[in-house]
Amino acid sequence: MTATRGFTLLEILLVLVLVSASAVAVIATFPVSVKDEAKISAQSFYQRLLLLNEEAILSGQDFGVRIDVDTRRLTFLQLTADKGWQKWQNDKMTNQTTLKEGLQLDFELGGGAWQKDDRLFNPGSLFDEEMFADEKKEQKQEPAPQLFVLSSGEVTPFTLSIFPKGQEPDEQWRVTAQENGTLRLLAPGESDEE
């Protein structure tokens, strides 16, 4: 009987498993580009806003989002009857997100009602708010949000652009809410006209 030379199927499969495992380990260590970070951040904000909109409709509560362009921070808020605007307490989602260092935000409220060109009155209260202040309620209240997600399904019209620092406007990922409450995620170069 002659002995055959060569590798068994088991040996070949073992080598393939080792090569594929090492390839996965190497690919996982590759850095993510800033353009990919912009895409991931825009998709994350869009999905969170959809979740917030659904939660508002189902629970009957009003929510808001505070956007700080300078610090690249997005804060999700909930309106409570006794404390006013507070950070949204949810086990499955963080209530505050800070974007990566290489990204930049551009935020613009939409709709004619939000523009300040044709105001009849100066913004602010007509009454002395200190007169009605309750000294017992000196609890820390979050600043009011710029975006409102109401239990009626309404969303403040806006455009939030997320892009790498120093890039042209055609590299922007945009999340928009239109006058009719439709939320859209727009890739770079994509137009929001349907």
From Swiss-Prot:
Residues 1-6 form a propeptide. The keyword Membrane applies. Keywords: Cell inner membrane, Cell membrane, Membrane, Methylation, Protein transport, Transmembrane, Transmembrane helix, Transport. InterPro entries: N_methyl_site, Pilin-like, T2SS_GspH, T2SS_protein-GspH, T2SS_protein_J, TypeII_GspH. It is a single-pass membrane protein. One of its GO terms (cellular component) is type II protein secretion system complex. It is found in: Cell inner membrane. Pfam families: GspH. The chain crosses the membrane at residues 12-32. The keyword Cell inner membrane applies. PROSITE patterns: PROKAR_NTER_METHYL. GO terms for biological process: protein secretion by the type II secretion system. Cleaved by prepilin peptidase. Methylated by prepilin peptidase at the amino group of the N-terminal phenylalanine once the leader sequence is cleaved by prepilin peptidase. The modification N-methylphenylalanine is found at residue 7. It comes from the Bacteria. Type II secretion is composed of four main components: the outer membrane complex, the inner membrane complex, the cytoplasmic secretion ATPase and the periplasm-spanning pseudopilus. Interacts with core component EpsG. Component of the type II secretion system required for the energy-dependent secretion of extracellular factors such as proteases and toxins from the periplasm. Part of the pseudopilus tip complex that is critical for the recognition and binding of secretion substrates. PANTHER family: TYPE II SECRETION SYSTEM PROTEIN J, TYPE II SECRETION SYSTEM PROTEIN J-RELATED. Belongs to the GSP H family. This is Type II secretion system protein H. It comes from Vibrio cholerae serotype O1 (strain ATCC 39315 / El Tor Inaba N16961).
